[in-house]
Protein backbone atom coordinates (compact mmCIF):
# COMPACT_ATOMS: atom_id res chain seq x y z
CA UNK A 1 0.00 0.00 0.00
CA UNK A 2 2.74 2.46 0.96
CA UNK A 3 4.80 2.00 -2.26
CA UNK A 4 1.64 2.56 -4.32
CA UNK A 5 0.80 5.77 -2.46
CA UNK A 6 4.37 7.03 -2.82
CA UNK A 7 4.34 6.29 -6.55
CA UNK A 8 0.99 8.08 -6.99
CA UNK A 9 2.29 11.14 -5.15
CA UNK A 10 5.57 11.24 -7.10
CA UNK A 11 4.25 10.49 -10.58
CA UNK A 12 0.68 11.86 -10.47
CA UNK A 13 0.03 14.35 -7.66
CA UNK A 14 3.28 16.35 -7.80
CA UNK A 15 3.27 16.76 -11.62
CA UNK A 16 -0.39 17.90 -11.57
CA UNK A 17 0.31 20.41 -8.80
CA UNK A 18 3.36 21.73 -10.64
CA UNK A 19 1.36 22.12 -13.86
CA UNK A 20 -1.40 23.94 -11.97
CA UNK A 21 1.12 26.34 -10.42
CA UNK A 22 2.66 27.00 -13.84
CA UNK A 23 -0.80 27.74 -15.27
CA UNK A 24 -1.11 30.71 -12.91
CA UNK A 25 1.86 32.46 -14.52
CA UNK A 26 2.53 33.88 -17.97
CA UNK A 27 5.68 34.90 -19.79
CA UNK A 28 7.47 38.12 -18.92
CA UNK A 29 6.96 41.08 -21.20
CA UNK A 30 10.10 41.58 -23.21
CA UNK A 31 11.82 44.86 -22.28
CA UNK A 32 12.67 47.03 -25.25
CA UNK A 33 15.68 49.19 -25.90
CA UNK A 34 16.42 51.83 -28.50
CA UNK A 35 19.25 50.75 -30.78
CA UNK A 36 21.12 53.00 -33.17
CA UNK A 37 22.10 51.30 -36.42
CA UNK A 38 24.56 53.03 -38.70
CA UNK A 39 25.55 52.30 -42.29
CA UNK A 40 27.33 54.28 -45.04
CA UNK A 41 24.09 56.11 -45.77
CA UNK A 42 23.55 57.32 -42.22
CA UNK A 43 22.25 56.24 -38.85
CA UNK A 44 18.75 55.33 -37.75
CA UNK A 45 17.20 54.26 -34.49
CA UNK A 46 15.20 51.06 -34.06
CA UNK A 47 13.41 49.41 -31.17
CA UNK A 48 14.76 46.01 -30.18
CA UNK A 49 14.55 43.54 -27.32
CA UNK A 50 16.88 44.04 -24.39
CA UNK A 51 18.19 40.48 -24.27
CA UNK A 52 20.24 40.92 -21.11
CA UNK A 53 17.39 42.49 -19.15
CA UNK A 54 14.98 39.80 -20.36
CA UNK A 55 17.40 37.05 -19.29
CA UNK A 56 17.76 38.69 -15.88
CA UNK A 57 13.96 38.78 -15.46
CA UNK A 58 13.66 35.09 -16.31
CA UNK A 59 16.46 34.24 -13.91
CA UNK A 60 14.88 36.23 -11.09
CA UNK A 61 11.34 34.89 -11.69
CA UNK A 62 11.60 31.69 -13.77
CA UNK A 63 7.85 31.02 -13.59
CA UNK A 64 7.04 34.35 -15.20
CA UNK A 65 4.50 36.99 -14.25
CA UNK A 66 1.64 36.01 -11.95
CA UNK A 67 -1.62 36.06 -13.88
CA UNK A 68 -3.94 34.07 -11.61
CA UNK A 69 -6.89 32.46 -13.35
CA UNK A 70 -6.97 35.01 -16.16
CA UNK A 71 -5.28 32.55 -18.50
CA UNK A 72 -8.16 30.11 -18.00
CA UNK A 73 -10.74 32.66 -19.17
CA UNK A 74 -8.83 34.31 -22.01
CA UNK A 75 -9.75 33.87 -25.67
CA UNK A 76 -7.55 30.81 -26.13
CA UNK A 77 -9.27 28.88 -23.33
CA UNK A 78 -12.74 29.22 -21.76
CA UNK A 79 -13.29 32.64 -23.39
CA UNK A 80 -16.21 33.72 -21.18
CA UNK A 81 -16.08 37.30 -22.47
CA UNK A 82 -16.08 36.27 -26.13
CA UNK A 83 -18.94 33.82 -25.54
CA UNK A 84 -21.02 36.49 -23.81
CA UNK A 85 -20.38 39.04 -26.55
CA UNK A 86 -21.11 36.46 -29.23
CA UNK A 87 -24.39 35.48 -27.56
CA UNK A 88 -25.42 39.12 -27.09
CA UNK A 89 -24.59 40.19 -30.63
CA UNK A 90 -25.91 37.12 -32.44
CA UNK A 91 -29.41 37.27 -33.86
CA UNK A 92 -29.61 33.56 -34.64
CA UNK A 93 -28.13 30.43 -33.14
CA UNK A 94 -26.15 29.78 -36.32
CA UNK A 95 -24.36 33.11 -35.88
CA UNK A 96 -23.47 32.20 -32.30
CA UNK A 97 -22.30 28.75 -33.39
CA UNK A 98 -19.85 30.36 -35.81
CA UNK A 99 -18.44 32.41 -32.95
CA UNK A 100 -18.32 29.30 -30.77
CA UNK A 101 -16.45 27.20 -33.33
CA UNK A 102 -13.95 29.98 -34.02
CA UNK A 103 -12.69 29.87 -30.43
CA UNK A 104 -9.63 27.58 -30.19
CA UNK A 105 -10.55 25.74 -26.98
CA UNK A 106 -14.13 24.95 -28.00
CA UNK A 107 -13.06 24.00 -31.51
CA UNK A 108 -10.68 21.48 -29.96
CA UNK A 109 -13.35 20.39 -27.46
CA UNK A 110 -15.89 19.54 -30.17
CA UNK A 111 -13.41 17.52 -32.22
CA UNK A 112 -11.96 15.72 -29.18
CA UNK A 113 -15.41 14.72 -27.90
CA UNK A 114 -16.58 13.67 -31.38
CA UNK A 115 -13.43 11.61 -31.92
CA UNK A 116 -13.68 9.97 -28.49
CA UNK A 117 -17.41 9.21 -28.63
CA UNK A 118 -17.15 7.63 -32.08
CA UNK A 119 -13.86 5.77 -31.80
CA UNK A 120 -14.38 4.26 -28.32
CA UNK A 121 -17.60 2.25 -28.95
CA UNK A 122 -16.49 1.18 -32.42
CA UNK A 123 -13.17 -0.04 -31.02
CA UNK A 124 -14.94 -2.08 -28.33
CA UNK A 125 -17.42 -3.64 -30.76
CA UNK A 126 -14.88 -4.33 -33.49
CA UNK A 127 -12.33 -5.73 -31.05
CA UNK A 128 -14.97 -8.05 -29.57
CA UNK A 129 -16.10 -9.28 -33.00
CA UNK A 130 -12.52 -9.93 -34.12
CA UNK A 131 -11.75 -11.78 -30.88
CA UNK A 132 -14.82 -14.00 -31.29
CA UNK A 133 -13.96 -14.72 -34.92
CA UNK A 134 -10.30 -15.59 -34.30
CA UNK A 135 -11.18 -17.68 -31.25
CA UNK A 136 -13.04 -20.11 -33.54
CA UNK A 137 -10.15 -20.56 -36.00
CA UNK A 138 -7.96 -23.65 -36.10
CA UNK A 139 -4.62 -23.55 -34.34
CA UNK A 140 -2.69 -23.66 -37.65
CA UNK A 141 -3.91 -20.28 -38.88
CA UNK A 142 -4.72 -18.67 -35.53
CA UNK A 143 -1.14 -17.51 -34.86
CA UNK A 144 -0.53 -15.76 -38.22
CA UNK A 145 -4.02 -14.22 -38.08
CA UNK A 146 -3.37 -12.77 -34.62
CA UNK A 147 -0.06 -11.33 -35.81
CA UNK A 148 -1.68 -9.63 -38.81
CA UNK A 149 -4.51 -8.33 -36.63
CA UNK A 150 -2.22 -6.59 -34.14
CA UNK A 151 -0.06 -4.94 -36.83
CA UNK A 152 -1.93 -1.59 -36.64
CA UNK A 153 -1.03 -1.34 -32.96
CA UNK A 154 2.62 -2.22 -33.60
CA UNK A 155 2.99 0.62 -36.09
CA UNK A 156 3.60 3.92 -34.31
CA UNK A 157 0.67 6.37 -34.59
CA UNK A 158 2.68 8.99 -36.45
CA UNK A 159 4.01 6.55 -39.05
CA UNK A 160 0.62 4.91 -39.49
CA UNK A 161 -1.10 8.25 -40.02
CA UNK A 162 1.59 9.34 -42.50
CA UNK A 163 1.18 6.14 -44.54
CA UNK A 164 -2.60 6.55 -44.65
CA UNK A 165 -2.17 10.26 -45.46
CA UNK A 166 -0.11 9.34 -48.53
CA UNK A 167 -2.61 6.65 -49.53
CA UNK A 168 -5.62 9.01 -49.46
CA UNK A 169 -3.75 11.68 -51.40
CA UNK A 170 -5.03 12.39 -54.91
CA UNK A 171 -2.06 10.43 -56.27
CA UNK A 172 -2.35 7.66 -53.66
CA UNK A 173 -4.07 4.33 -54.17
CA UNK A 174 -7.14 5.15 -52.05
CA UNK A 175 -7.50 8.76 -53.21
CA UNK A 176 -7.22 7.95 -56.92
CA UNK A 177 -9.61 4.99 -56.55
CA UNK A 178 -12.25 7.20 -54.92
CA UNK A 179 -11.88 9.75 -57.72
CA UNK A 180 -12.40 7.01 -60.31
CA UNK A 181 -15.43 5.57 -58.48
CA UNK A 182 -17.20 8.93 -58.25
CA UNK A 183 -15.85 10.16 -61.61
CA UNK A 184 -14.64 13.36 -59.95
CA UNK A 185 -10.96 14.26 -60.48
CA UNK A 186 -11.20 17.01 -57.85
CA UNK A 187 -12.65 14.87 -55.06
CA UNK A 188 -10.30 14.71 -52.08
CA UNK A 189 -10.66 13.31 -48.58
CA UNK A 190 -8.59 16.26 -47.36
CA UNK A 191 -10.74 18.92 -49.01
CA UNK A 192 -13.39 19.44 -46.33
CA UNK A 193 -13.65 19.42 -42.56
CA UNK A 194 -16.22 16.60 -42.49
CA UNK A 195 -14.16 14.30 -44.71
CA UNK A 196 -11.06 15.05 -42.64
CA UNK A 197 -12.89 14.18 -39.41
CA UNK A 198 -14.22 10.95 -40.94
CA UNK A 199 -10.71 10.02 -42.06
CA UNK A 200 -9.23 10.70 -38.62
CA UNK A 201 -11.98 8.73 -36.87
CA UNK A 202 -11.53 5.82 -39.28
CA UNK A 203 -7.80 5.82 -38.62
CA UNK A 204 -8.44 5.91 -34.85
CA UNK A 205 -10.68 2.85 -35.06
CA UNK A 206 -8.13 1.02 -37.21
CA UNK A 207 -5.24 1.83 -34.89
CA UNK A 208 -6.91 1.14 -31.51
CA UNK A 209 -8.99 -1.95 -32.36
CA UNK A 210 -6.05 -4.40 -31.89
CA UNK A 211 -5.78 -3.37 -28.23
CA UNK A 212 -9.43 -4.23 -27.61
CA UNK A 213 -8.99 -7.45 -29.57
CA UNK A 214 -6.01 -8.60 -27.48
CA UNK A 215 -7.77 -7.94 -24.18
CA UNK A 216 -11.03 -9.58 -25.30
CA UNK A 217 -9.18 -12.56 -26.77
CA UNK A 218 -7.32 -13.13 -23.51
CA UNK A 219 -10.56 -12.80 -21.56
CA UNK A 220 -12.31 -15.32 -23.83
CA UNK A 221 -9.84 -17.96 -22.68
CA UNK A 222 -11.19 -17.56 -19.14
CA UNK A 223 -14.86 -18.12 -20.04
CA UNK A 224 -16.03 -21.22 -18.11
CA UNK A 225 -17.06 -24.10 -20.34
CA UNK A 226 -19.73 -25.55 -18.03
CA UNK A 227 -22.32 -22.77 -18.65
CA UNK A 228 -21.63 -22.94 -22.39
CA UNK A 229 -22.09 -26.71 -22.47
CA UNK A 230 -25.28 -26.38 -20.42
CA UNK A 231 -26.57 -23.77 -22.88
CA UNK A 232 -25.80 -26.09 -25.80
CA UNK A 233 -27.72 -28.91 -24.12
CA UNK A 234 -30.66 -26.53 -23.61
CA UNK A 235 -30.66 -25.81 -27.35
CA UNK A 236 -29.14 -22.33 -27.31
CA UNK A 237 -27.62 -21.22 -30.60
CA UNK A 238 -24.27 -19.42 -30.94
CA UNK A 239 -25.74 -15.91 -30.63
CA UNK A 240 -27.69 -16.87 -27.49
CA UNK A 241 -24.56 -18.37 -25.91
CA UNK A 242 -22.64 -15.19 -26.65
CA UNK A 243 -25.42 -12.96 -25.37
CA UNK A 244 -26.27 -14.77 -22.13
CA UNK A 245 -22.93 -16.40 -21.21
CA UNK A 246 -19.97 -14.71 -22.87
CA UNK A 247 -20.99 -11.04 -22.75
CA UNK A 248 -21.90 -11.02 -19.01
CA UNK A 249 -18.57 -12.69 -18.27
CA UNK A 250 -16.65 -10.10 -20.32
CA UNK A 251 -18.55 -7.04 -19.08
CA UNK A 252 -15.83 -5.96 -16.59
CA UNK A 253 -13.26 -6.34 -19.36
CA UNK A 254 -15.35 -4.12 -21.65
CA UNK A 255 -15.50 -1.45 -18.93
CA UNK A 256 -11.73 -1.61 -18.58
CA UNK A 257 -11.25 -1.24 -22.34
CA UNK A 258 -13.70 1.68 -22.41
CA UNK A 259 -11.80 3.52 -19.67
CA UNK A 260 -8.40 3.01 -21.30
CA UNK A 261 -9.70 3.85 -24.78
CA UNK A 262 -11.41 7.03 -23.63
CA UNK A 263 -8.29 8.29 -21.89
CA UNK A 264 -6.21 7.40 -24.94
CA UNK A 265 -8.60 8.96 -27.46
CA UNK A 266 -8.96 12.23 -25.55
CA UNK A 267 -5.25 12.89 -26.05
CA UNK A 268 -5.38 12.32 -29.82
CA UNK A 269 -2.45 14.12 -31.41
CA UNK A 270 -0.28 12.11 -33.84
CA UNK A 271 -3.01 11.58 -36.48
CA UNK A 272 -3.65 15.33 -36.65
CA UNK A 273 0.04 15.95 -37.17
CA UNK A 274 0.46 13.09 -39.63
CA UNK A 275 -2.55 14.10 -41.73
CA UNK A 276 -1.59 17.81 -41.60
CA UNK A 277 -5.17 18.39 -40.47
CA UNK A 278 -4.53 21.33 -38.11
CA UNK A 279 -6.79 23.62 -40.14
CA UNK A 280 -9.80 21.28 -39.88
CA UNK A 281 -9.24 19.34 -36.66
CA UNK A 282 -7.58 20.41 -33.44
CA UNK A 283 -7.38 18.56 -30.14
CA UNK A 284 -6.28 19.55 -26.65
CA UNK A 285 -2.94 17.82 -27.19
CA UNK A 286 -2.43 19.80 -30.39
CA UNK A 287 -3.19 23.06 -28.55
CA UNK A 288 -0.52 22.20 -25.98
CA UNK A 289 1.92 21.35 -28.76
CA UNK A 290 1.10 24.61 -30.54
CA UNK A 291 1.87 26.60 -27.37
CA UNK A 292 5.23 24.89 -26.92
CA UNK A 293 6.56 24.50 -30.46
CA UNK A 294 7.87 28.07 -30.64
CA UNK A 295 11.41 27.67 -29.31
CA UNK A 296 11.92 31.40 -28.73
CA UNK A 297 8.65 32.03 -26.86
CA UNK A 298 7.11 28.94 -25.28
CA UNK A 299 3.72 29.66 -23.74
CA UNK A 300 4.14 27.42 -20.71
CA UNK A 301 1.26 29.09 -18.85
CA UNK A 302 -1.19 28.58 -21.70
CA UNK A 303 -0.06 24.98 -22.23
CA UNK A 304 -0.38 24.26 -18.51
CA UNK A 305 -3.89 25.76 -18.42
CA UNK A 306 -4.96 23.57 -21.33
CA UNK A 307 -3.49 20.54 -19.55
CA UNK A 308 -5.46 21.25 -16.37
CA UNK A 309 -8.68 21.76 -18.34
CA UNK A 310 -8.00 18.47 -20.15
CA UNK A 311 -7.57 16.66 -16.84
CA UNK A 312 -10.87 18.12 -15.62
CA UNK A 313 -12.65 17.01 -18.80
CA UNK A 314 -11.22 13.49 -18.50
CA UNK A 315 -12.47 13.35 -14.92
CA UNK A 316 -15.96 14.47 -15.99
CA UNK A 317 -16.15 11.87 -18.77
CA UNK A 318 -14.89 9.01 -16.61
CA UNK A 319 -16.90 9.83 -13.49
CA UNK A 320 -20.17 8.07 -14.56
CA UNK A 321 -18.31 4.89 -15.54
CA UNK A 322 -16.23 4.90 -12.36
CA UNK A 323 -19.30 5.47 -10.15
CA UNK A 324 -21.17 2.62 -11.83
CA UNK A 325 -18.16 0.32 -11.52
CA UNK A 326 -17.70 1.22 -7.86
CA UNK A 327 -21.38 0.50 -7.10
CA UNK A 328 -21.23 -2.87 -8.83
CA UNK A 329 -18.03 -3.69 -6.96
CA UNK A 330 -19.70 -2.79 -3.66
CA UNK A 331 -22.76 -4.91 -4.44
CA UNK A 332 -20.63 -7.93 -5.36
CA UNK A 333 -18.75 -7.89 -2.05
Describe the function of each predicted region.
Residues 1-333:
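A structural signal for multi-pass alpha-helical bundles of membrane permease subunits
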Amino acid sequence: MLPTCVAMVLFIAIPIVSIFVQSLFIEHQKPTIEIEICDPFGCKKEIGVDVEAYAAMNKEKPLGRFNGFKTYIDRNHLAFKELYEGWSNSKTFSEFSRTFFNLPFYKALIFTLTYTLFVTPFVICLGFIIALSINTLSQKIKGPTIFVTILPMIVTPLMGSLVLFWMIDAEGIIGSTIQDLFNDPYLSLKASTKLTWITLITYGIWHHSPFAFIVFYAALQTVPQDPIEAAIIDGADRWQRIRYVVIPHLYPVAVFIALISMMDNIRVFEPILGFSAEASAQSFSWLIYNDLRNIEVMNFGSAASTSILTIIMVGILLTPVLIKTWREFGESR
